[in-house]
Regions:
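Class I S-adenosyl-L-methionine-dependent methyltransferase catalytic core
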Residues: 1-127
Length: 127
């Protein structure tokens, strides 16, 4: 991912402790004990206005407590598997105002459930 700033625990910088600015790509650690903290942080940074747009690459564990909050965002359920560790498929989550653009781009790789207006949703699959 082409980014201006990287946060990595290996480098001693936790993204949970930093303010996120502008456009953010998040691939959080998938441990059960911490993943909810990362989801909460993403929603907080977006709602505060610090992060304009956030894309989260995460496993599609729709049966988990932390995933329930993601239904408030636009989602792309990737068709097929991205070769990561683990048995789940992948979901890209979008927090931002460009839901139509997210749907246009990400429907090329999976089925997108995007917010339209209010509580309305649109489903688009090109694959």
């Amino acid at each position: 991912v082409n980014a201006h700033v990287y946060y990595s625990l290996a480098e001693g910088r936790s993204g949970l402790a930093e303010q996120w600015l502008g456009r953010v790509f998040l691939n959080p650690p998938y441990g059960r004990q911490v993943i909810g903290d990362w989801i909460d942080k993403a929603f907080h940074e977006h709602k505060s206005g610090s992060a304009d747009e956030i894309i989260i690459c995460i496993n599609n564990a729709t049966d988990t407590k932390w995933f329930a909050r993601l239904w408030d965002a636009s989602l792309c359920f990737v068709q097929g598997r991205i070769p990561f560790w683990g048995a789940h498929g992948t979901v890209f989550v979008y927090l931002g105002e460009n839901n139509e653009k997210f749907s246009e781009v990400f429907s090329e790789i999976g089925c997108v459930i995007s917010r339209t207006d209010g509580d309305n949703r649109r489903i688009e699959c090109k694959v």
